[in-house]
Amino acid sequence: MKNLINQRLFWLIVAFACYSINLPAQLSDIKTENGLVSGYKSGEISIFKGIPFAAPPVGDLRWKAPQPLKNWTGVLKCDKFSASPMQRKPVPFMMWTEEFITPPEKLSEDCLYLNIWTPAKSAKDKLPVFVWIYGGGFSSGSAACAVYDGEEMSKKGIIFVSINYRVGVLGFMAHPELSRESGARVSGNYGLLDQVAALDWIKKNIEAFGGDPQKVTIAGQSAGSMSVCALVASPLAKGLFRGAIAQSGGILSSFMKSNLTEAEKSGLTFMEKLKSANITELRQKSAEELIAAGGNFGPVYDGYVIPVDVFAAFKNGQFNDVTMMAGWVDGDGSLMGEQKMTPEKYKQQAIDKYGDKAEEYLKLFPGNTNEQVTASLLELNLMQFAALPAHLWAGFSKNTAYIYQFSHVPVDKPGFPNYGAFHTSEVPFALHTLHLWKRPWREIDFAVEKTMNDFWVNFVKTGNPNGNDLQEWAKYDKSTGRIMEIGDHPKLSPGLHKGEFDFLEGTINNK
């Protein structure tokens, strides 16, 4: 009997030990401005998920700038992601929707939280900080998507932070009533104000996690990239970061063009659609009702968060001139969809738009056949959405600039056609998260991932992507147009797209 009891006790101890191994190891509590937080350990990395950085934007705080947090007592357990911002469930229209856009967590208006991965051993380590801003067309997205996991990147000696921000109607609707009740007399851009609030929280608190508040680099992709550019343009973000990485998206183009007056009109139309008499009634609607009503909302050139004339602001040096890295994916143009147009109509549009410059335009973007027209329109989309804004920003900057083009073609996803180097495909390569993306990866994919992530980490640490025996990446200047082409074998490509850049920039300057 005694032996039987001892055997059972032995196996209970073994079972408990195995169970304990699978539990996240606990950390010492971290003191933030608002109270203590606890996280967990994964190997040498300390992880904190779901740290609040602003008061929940619910009730009367809906459609208001983020408000300060209230202090809490005790220890706030931060070991799982918060709810994702309210949004429509994305239709899986492309091969990456599930991985990049569809939030894995529940949805809630109470979504202003951030996540931290840190390898620091103490608050004195003063490590550089990388802040990730997700994309999703300003209508969807979440910091909880697995492809934005920061553990691998933090193993290289940096602190990785991912942040949530409001999207869609709850993040960007402007309205005359909202403008009147705002101290700044503007409305909309709440999602961008969330980002500023998160950066302000990071500046005040990241030292407790072993970070250096003077060494913050912001980065984002698509709408996240446009957010990065908006923060560079915003006087509200001055001093909150020292470097910026913009992946596939900018605001120095015609893609974003809504001013406050136009945005307020859209808000009035939306209110009428929901048969609400005023903002008070609209605030009483459920978030689900608001989202079901549709609408297209995004950042606004309001003169407060973003300058009314961004191009003029950059041209006159009125922006946060930080060290920058910007680029695009070879297939970014397909984001706007394939446009059908006859060669005759295409050429006439070129004449109508460019006049005596039409001949030069048609040499750069030919349209003699249907196939040429389609290819040229895709190229023009790429230029306007991502490539030209990066080129212009680098030209206006007095700081160091690095430009890239991602052309590596990832392995196919079963059941989908091959999209080539498609919009968003570079993200897991840059963030070192291929292992979280379900594909039959090849050695070349992992080699490109290592190279690209090393470039990114080096830039976060020093403001320079070079080092680690990598292909030398020269600083960008408009005269030579040297661009790092990140393909199977990264190489510096002088003059890539230089003709297109020169022509399109000339048309802007002549307006």
Task: State each model region's role.
Residues 1-27:
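Bacterial Sec-dependent N-terminal signal peptides
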Residues 34, 194, 212, 301-302, ...:
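Acidic/polar residues in short coil/turn loops that connect beta-strands
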Residues 96-279, 314-337:
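Serine-hydrolase-like catalytic core of hydrolytic proteins
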Residues 107, 388-511:
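Mobile gating loops/cap/lid regions near enzyme active sites that modulate substrate access
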